[in-house]
Regions:
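Aromatic- and histidine-enriched alpha-helix N-cap/loop-to-helix transition segments
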Residues: 42-46, 71, 150
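Canonical alpha-helical transmembrane segments of integral membrane proteins
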Residues: 43-53, 119-128
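Long, highly hydrophobic alpha-helical transmembrane signal-anchor segments
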Residues: 45-67
Length: 196
């Protein structure tokens, strides 16, 4: 009877171990998909900036010309970031994740978007400062146009980063409590660990 109970426990724990692995793979695929889609959004914004502002730089209004020039520059940088981000998410291997790997990835992506949001606030502030001090500069139109563009780009990125952070944060809530239970198996071994 004891052997039967031990065998039943072994089968149950093994099933849980495989179910946990499948759940981790599913979670990682979803996180990767969110990352790729967010890079497509950033890439779309960047391309739109480059196209629209590329045409709009042909204006007689000097302030608006500088505004659009800066939009094109930001668009190029953001397009490169979006391309590299998409490529990085695409090549990421998620076929055999451990719980520690999943938690590390989730923590890293949430921190990244929080740090980015902080930088976005700095961009908006820098653009505002350029705008407000433009009259004291040798080329006030350039400072004002660049400042307005930096405020626009920083404002968009702040909203973008806040939304993407919220998406990843809500997705990460699926892991709440999971880190307390760890099941693993290997050749000749089986372990179930519950952390209080």
């Amino acid at each position: 009877m004891q052997k039967f109970i031990l065998l039943l426990c072994l089968i149950t724990v093994t099933q849980y171990s495989f179910a946990q692995k499948d759940a981790l793979i599913k979670f990682e695929k979803e996180r990767k998909n969110y990352s790729k889609k967010s890079m497509l959004v950033l890439g779309g914004w960047s391309a739109a900036n480059m196209i629209v502002s590329g045409f709009a730089t042909n204006t007689r209004n000097r302030e608006m010309r500088y505004f659009h020039q800066m939009n094109v520059m930001w668009g190029g940088i953001n397009l490169a970031i979006a391309g590299l981000g998409y490529w990085g998410a695409e090549k990421e291997k998620i076929d055999n994740p451990t719980l520690a790997d999943v938690l590390k990835h989730q923590n890293r992506i949430e921190k990244t978007y929080l740090i980015n949001a902080g930088l976005d606030v700095v961009y908006v502030g820098a653009g505002l400062l350029m705008n407000k001090t433009s009259e004291n500069q040798k080329n006030p139109d350039k400072f004002k146009g660049y400042g307005n563009s930096i405020m626009l780009q920083g404002g968009f990125l702040l909203i973008y980063d806040a939304i993407i952070y919220t998406i990843h944060r809500n997705h990460g809530k699926q892991l709440k409590g999971v880190e307390k239970v760890t099941v693993s198996s290997g050749p000749g071994s089986l372990s179930l660990i519950y952390t209080f």
